[in-house]
Design a protein with these regions (language model features):
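Bacterial N-terminal signal peptides
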Residues: 4-14
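Sec/Tat signal peptide C-region and signal peptidase I cleavage site
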Residues: 15-19
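Extracellular/periplasmic metallocenter environments
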Residues: 20-25, 39, 88-131
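N-terminal edge beta-strand
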Residues: 22-52
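N-terminal post-signal-peptidase region of extra-cytosolic proteins
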Residues: 35-43, 54, 84-89, 96
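A mature extracytoplasmic/lumenal domain signature
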Residues: 37, 51, 59-61, 69-73, ...
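Beta-strand cores of secreted/periplasmic/IMS beta-sandwich domains, seen most often
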Residues: 43-67, 97-106, 110
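Short aromatic-acidic-glycine turn motif
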Residues: 73-82
């Protein structure tokens, strides 16, 4: 019983510290990423490590398009309300659809690509560089 009380007390003490580590999402830098048929714009996405960013994705095509970067999203701290969008490392957008995702990127070089094989073969890939 005493051990359970100690564990509960430790949890209560750690909760405010965890809340303080959340980024200030309102100050996030905004970056637009366009999904065109067979390409992303920009092809190289440059972000600052440890700084919150709001990524605005827009499907500028005439068909469903996707953006997959599983390792990037897994390494980044994604805002809690946006995690459902990248549950499997990416998402799909219908023509004209928009999606914004706030995250704190981890340093590294990451690869993004379409979830559709034909689109990947035609060059629908991008690099994400976080320094």
């Amino acid at each position: 019983m005493r051990l359970a009380l100690l564990a509960f007390a430790a949890l209560l003490l750690a909760a405010p510290a965890a809340a303080q580590r959340q980024p200030e999402w309102r100050t996030a830098t905004e970056v637009d990423i366009l999904l065109h048929p067979f390409r992303y714009e920009p092809r190289t996405i440059r972000l600052r490590a440890g700084q919150p960013v709001l990524l605005h994705f827009v499907n500028d095509g005439f068909a469903n398009l996707s953006f997959r970067a599983p390792r990037f999203f897994a390494a980044s701290l994604v805002r809690r309300s946006d995690r459902r969008h990248v549950r499997n490392g990416g998402f799909r957008l219908r023509p004209g659809e928009r999606l914004s995702i706030a995250l704190m990127p981890a340093p590294g070089h990451w690869r993004a690509r379409s979830g559709y094989l034909l689109h990947r073969l035609r060059g629908m890939t991008a690099r994400i560089i976080v320094e």
